[in-house]
Regions:
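AlphaC helix of the eukaryotic protein kinase fold
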Residues: 1-7
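Activation-segment/catalytic-loop signature of the eukaryotic protein kinase fold
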Residues: 20
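Conserved short submotifs of the Hanks-type protein kinase catalytic core
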Residues: 24-38, 42
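Activation segment signature within eukaryotic-like protein kinase domains
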Residues: 57-58
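Protein kinase catalytic-loop region centered on the HRD/HxD motif
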Residues: 61-73
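Activation-loop N-terminal segment of eukaryotic-like protein kinases
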Residues: 85-89
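C-terminal lobe helix-coil module of Hanks-type protein kinase domains
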Residues: 117-183
Length: 183
């Protein structure tokens, strides 16, 4: 995990690692302190966000995910549990414990890492191909929750019977193209 994060240096939207070492058969990672709130806690307290705020925050998350992907890394655990909101104009993505390289055999044969409501269908399957699209699914699920206040149903359930209502159907004031992108 530390080696994955260390590649990003002083990125403003990915947690910074200052040092990592192993001692007494235990791995230690020294990371920056982030003064803020987990997106998960924010959503539990506030329910949902105004569309303008949600779209701004998702843009910040997308930029962080683009940086992660630019290093050939699939995060595989993008969720509100792993995103800090440190101010209105800053987020931090962390927890790279499930990360895999996209072009490696590992990326093609990943173990299951499942975060209910945010995991793409391929994450539920044994020895499935996972790629950058795995993280993109998670980003869409986060945006859905930020706009509606509803955590999406499991992706595997949606494959069989999709009853998830779009943000527009739920009365969220967004453009139809944004609604289609989410769904």
């Amino acid at each position: 995990e530390a080696q994955s994060i260390a590649q990003f240096g002083k990125a403003k939207d990915i947690v910074n690692v200052y040092a990592f070492f192993e001692e007494n058969n235990t791995a230690y990672i020294i990371m920056e302190y982030i003064d803020g709130v987990l997106l998960k806690d924010y959503l539990e307290k506030q329910g949902k966000m105004e569309p303008k705020v949600a779209l701004h925050i998702i843009d910040l998350i997308i930029n962080a995910v683009k940086k992660i992907h630019s290093k050939g890394i699939i995060h595989r655990d993008i969720s509100p549990d792993n995103i800090f909101i440190s101010s209105e104009d800053a987020i931090k993505v962390f927890d790279f414990g499930a990360a895999q390289l996209n072009d490696s055999a590992e990326g093609k044969n990943c173990e299951k890492v499942i975060k209910v409501g945010y995991s793409a269908p391929e994450q539920y399957r044994d020895k499935s191909n996972q790629g950058f699209y795995t993280d993109i699914y998670s980003v869409g699920a986060i945006l859905y929750q930020m706009l509606t206040g509803i955590k999406p149903m499991e992706s595997t359930e949606r494959e069989h019977k999709d009853t998830l209502k779009s943000p527009l159907e739920l009365g969220v004031k967004i453009e139809p193209n944004v609604d289609r992108a989410i769904m």
